[in-house]
Design a protein with these regions (language model features):
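Long, low-complexity, charged/polar intrinsically disordered regions in eukaryotic proteins
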Residues: 1-40
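DNA-recognition alpha helix
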Residues: 43-71
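Conserved interaction-surface patches within small, structured recognition/assembly domains
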Residues: 69-80
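Short, hydrophobic-biased segments on the C-terminal half of alpha helices
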Residues: 79, 84-88
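A short, conserved structural fragment
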Residues: 87-102
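Minor-groove-contacting beta-hairpin "wing" of winged helix-turn-helix DNA-binding domains
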Residues: 102-109
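Short, amphipathic alpha-helical interaction segments positioned at domain boundaries
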Residues: 110-133
Length: 133
């Protein structure tokens, strides 16, 4: 996944930087809340139940964003698109970790660590090219 951003106009919400549509942002944020509510770890089966509830429009939550702030709403999101556009990118970027042995999803800090490493790689490349950084 590619993250393009304008450093002078960064949104306050990191989900707006990572995900391209408001609906993706809402679903990704709800997934993280769901993981937190389940002690930061859920099984593959529970993830499938979450995706199915979204697909059937039965997932209820209270949103933090206008115009639905504070209201209980039912979210609907296609199951295939959930896996393709939300879960898979979150795994590949290090926001969520999947343990192949335990078959569980957990919240991960790898994303933050990788961004720091990318910044260091950028500085190293500039120095290698002769720039004073």
């Amino acid at each position: 996944m590619v993250i393009l951003f304008d450093r002078f106009n960064l949104p306050k919400d990191v989900f707006e930087i990572i995900f391209s549509t408001p609906q993706q942002k809402i679903v990704a944020k709800e997934l993280i809340k769901y993981l937190i509510d389940n002690k930061g770890e859920i099984s593959k089966t529970i993830m499938s139940v979450f995706a199915t509830k979204l697909h059937e429009g039965q997932y209820e939550c209270i949103l933090d964003d206008p115009p639905y702030k504070g209201r209980t709403v039912k979210l609907s999101y296609n199951k295939r698109q959930f896996y393709d556009r939300i879960l898979t990118p979150m795994k590949s970027m290090g926001l969520i970790n999947y343990d192949l042995y335990k078959k569980t999803y957990t919240i991960s800090a790898k994303f933050s660590n990788d961004l720091l490493e990318i910044g260091l790689m950028w500085k190293h490349e500039l120095r290698k090219m002769g720039a004073q950084v």
